[in-house]
Amino acid sequence: MKTFMDKDFLLYNETAKTLFYNYACKCPIFDYHCHLNPKEIAENKKFKNITEIWLYGDHYKWRMMRANGIDEKFITGDASDYDKFIAWVKTVPNLIGNPLYHWSHLELQRYFDIHEVINEDNADTIWEKANQKLQNMTVKDILKKFKVHTIGTTDDPTDNLEYHKLINEGKAQIGKIYTKVVPSFRPDKAINIEMPDFSDYIKKLENASKINIKDINSLTEALYNRIDYFKSLGCVSSDCSLSIVPFNLDDEKNIDAIFKKAMNKESLNFEDIEKYKTYILIKLIKKYKESNLVMQIHISAMRNNNEVMFKKLGADTGYDSVGDSNIIEKLSFLLKTANNDGGLPKIIFYSLNHKDYYPLSTLMGCFQEGSIKGKMQLGSAWWFCDNRDGMEEQIKILANTGSLALFVGMLTDSRSFLSYSRHEYFRRILCNIIGEWADKGEVPNDIKYLGSIIENICFNNSNIYFNN
């Protein structure tokens, strides 16, 4: 019988162990998409207790606490940090088979050298040991420990990026660090014309860009202005979230009329919304191509399903789910149209619905180019798919339909500084898959060859992809 989560956790063959210990675990981390707060990095934040670093803002854990009958007071309410910690510890034993069960134990092991099984009997021991370690742990210590080479934060076009500037000039409180912290351009609020605060947001964009946004052309100009600003501060990537993929072409005059209706807070129908989004996305794709920015597209998240709780707590609090729309046909038209209008940038496609992996992977193969290796990427298993089964499925589908060796690998997509252990989780799974292939004679048992593929997926590919 194997020991629970020992050093060979998830490594079920000797080749996998060799690949992990000699190659994967030595690689730096290129975390090209996350939701870390750059202010906390700049200020070299020190966390007051394990609840703050483990549970604050982590809606993955919040969902499971609710499912386990924990009152909201102990999740997002005014209970003490200790009581919230106890509520989470009571939840964990019921999560067997859930990735949070593995992640939570891995976080305790790697950050705090705590190897106890999480349960109520061990709660006070874990609380005391972790808090003792946190007295001498800052963000800078975490980034150094996990060899974090690059952090790509997620930023609104109106952000002034003051903390990115301070960090990369070595003038922030954190001082000079090995880690590069770069902004990513996420214009969702300028795309989502149907939102009630759209016109207010455009005024904010107007102030940030110092461009009078009076029509669709000046809106495009303002967005391009902010892309240039982001680029000047090291931005290498954009991102957008699409619950459904729009495609409905119309002439610029009609798009301008739709935009002006929205600015006057007039109601828009679905056709108006789709036409506007199609137009703006094509304009952004063109600019990303010209600016050599990677475009990340996150598709099929159905957000804020529970209106009662959305009104109480706002977005990103655990009330999103997997969407189930047919994305491929319209995505094909969108890519085809943008490609005809100057070409496509490098694009990473993510879907929250795993049924889209085969269609996405084969569609992106239609837009690969000989000049750039792996120009189009099937993104790592995301959010609800970000578990062992989901990672294995994404890796194998990519291998079956494309070039796994060119994959840009894992990202945290997280708000927590404890999430770097997820890179280890992914790396173990990757090494186990390739090791199993080697042990079965399906690929050459050439450790140097396989090791180079592991190193490339874990770090080298992303470093080249985002920096060339």
Curated annotation (Swiss-Prot):
Keywords: Isomerase. SUPFAM superfamilies: Metallo-dependent hydrolases. It is an enzyme of class 5 (isomerase). Pfam families: UxaC (PF02614). The keyword Isomerase applies. Pathway: Carbohydrate metabolism; pentose and glucuronate interconversion. The keyword Isomerase applies. One of its GO terms (biological process) is D-galacturonate catabolic process. It catalyses: D-glucuronate = D-fructuronate; aldehydo-D-galacturonate = keto-D-tagaturonate. Its EC number is 5.3.1.12. One of its GO terms (molecular function) is glucuronate isomerase activity. Coiled coil: none annotated. Belongs to the metallo-dependent hydrolases superfamily. Uronate isomerase family. NCBIfam families: PRK02925.1. This is Uronate isomerase. It comes from Brachyspira hyodysenteriae (strain ATCC 49526 / WA1).
